[in-house]
């Protein structure tokens, strides 16, 4: 009977050996084969297929009960309050992240959603090793981010939409050269990578322009190049399209989609622009007030509201529907400035409600739409708030 091979993982590499014959050992990437979790593969499966099978099942990012509590000084107002604070200070604790757990496989492009202050950026910083968690643990490609090992630093990149890593008074190309030296990237590899990224983002004519003289969209493209020069396997993006015009947003989204498809980079994206999420992510993780409230397919989240449609009706002048009609058709809203009348109704009644609208009075225009993702997310936050209220 053929014995199966047993594979171990450390730093996202696979090491295989025959269980019944210790003289047979294959070290695919070169490291200690005794470290890491065990993974079993069929005995005659070629090693390169074993490697692919292994990576398709082992998470790239594992987060278990990750919590971060910030302790802040509570200042008492007034002069004597300041004096008292010199001797006896009062502090309050605020949990930015509470027992967050999730796993992300290699190559996944996951949206990380939540309102301002929900804990998204805090979580990304913990995964990057910039801040320590109060409790819980995380593993990224087998590494513990809190140890800040150099090998791990070469594995990931963090892009913060509102913070720059490029030197303001230098051309972008000089910042790239400095990053090449920091990461120890060979010159030939650096040139190949840079040429590819510059071509994909169409910024070849801007490399020698001072960063301070670039537009916001051009600066963000340069930030992405800087983050990807060392070919990271994991990319954390914190609102990369914030403040960009529509054309720049589209260019950045197109680049990220193509880069993820081509190199299977694992990407965790936060954004308040739902167009980013809809175009790039098949899965979303939603957090609110530090708690995870949804983790699953974006389609499933939308399907939760898919049983409803939104009817937009434009009424001429001061025309209005009878009060008895508006009160009997669920959620209705009238905008007196635009004359727009909005009705949300179940999909199965959409035809009947539309016909009733048209027969009720003069209508300038009528449109039937799906409920926007922004509204679905907002309703998710609202329902979570309602559940958390004491009875």
Question: Which residues make up each language-model segment?
Answer:
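ABC transporter nucleotide-binding domain
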Residues: 253-344
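Catalytic Walker B motif of ABC-type/P-loop ATPase nucleotide-binding domains
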Residues: 235-239
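Conserved catalytic motifs of ABC-family nucleotide-binding domains
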Residues: 231
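Conserved ABC ATPase "signature" region
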Residues: 78-86, 177, 181, 188-206
